[in-house]
Curated annotation (Swiss-Prot):
<dbReference type="GO" id="GO:0085034">
    <property type="term" value="P:symbiont-mediated suppression of host NF-kappaB cascade"/>
</dbReference>
<keyword id="KW-1100">Inhibition of host NF-kappa-B by virus</keyword>
<dbReference type="GO" id="GO:0039722">
    <property type="term" value="P:symbiont-mediated suppression of host toll-like receptor signaling pathway"/>
</dbReference>
<dbReference type="Pfam" id="PF02512">
    <property type="entry name" value="UK"/>
</dbReference>
<keyword id="KW-1090">Inhibition of host innate immune response by virus</keyword>
<comment type="function">
    <text>Inhibits cGAS-STING-mediated type I IFN expression and NF-kB activation by inhibiting TBK1 and IKBKB/IKKB. Inhibits host TBK1 phosphorylation.</text>
</comment>
<protein>
    <recommendedName>
        <fullName>TBK1 inhibitor DP96R</fullName>
    </recommendedName>
</protein>
<dbReference type="InterPro" id="IPR003670">
    <property type="entry name" value="ASFV_DP96R"/>
</dbReference>
<keyword id="KW-0899">Viral immunoevasion</keyword>
<keyword id="KW-1225">Inhibition of host TLR pathway by virus</keyword>
<keyword id="KW-0945">Host-virus interaction</keyword>
<keyword id="KW-1223">Inhibition of host TBK1 by virus</keyword>
<comment type="similarity">
    <text>Belongs to the asfivirus DP96R family.</text>
</comment>
<dbReference type="GO" id="GO:0039723">
    <property type="term" value="P:symbiont-mediated suppression of host cytoplasmic pattern recognition receptor signaling pathway via inhibition of TBK1 activity"/>
</dbReference>
Length: 95
């Protein structure tokens, strides 16, 4: 007898099945106002360009580059110190 209760809502997602992943993304609840939004990664962008665009937005105090102004928190400022090294390394080795 299994003690695991798999309700239909909490079915594990098969990460190899694209349509299941899309269902999870498309059916996700709306984020509350002011929640961090991650910019779209355009097809022609490399990962490095996308990360750089994301960081530009954070450094300007925005959730999304050029949109949704938000005051930078101390956590953002502390994280940026660590994140910049990772960003520089990823830009050097990426596509």
């Amino acid at each position: 007898m299994s003690t695991h209760n798999n309700s239909p809502k909490e079915k594990p997602v098969d990460m190899n099945n694209i349509s299941e992943k899309l269902d999870v993304v498309n059916n996700a609840p709306e984020k509350p106002a002011g929640a961090n939004h991650i910019p779209e990664k355009l097809a022609e962008m490399t990962s490095s360009e996308w990360i750089a665009e994301y960081w530009k937005g954070i450094n300007r105090g925005n959730d999304v580059p050029c949109c949704c102004p938000r005051k930078m928190t101390s956590a953002d400022k502390k994280f940026s110190v660590f994140g910049k090294g990772y960003l520089m390394r990823s830009m050097q080795k990426d596509d």
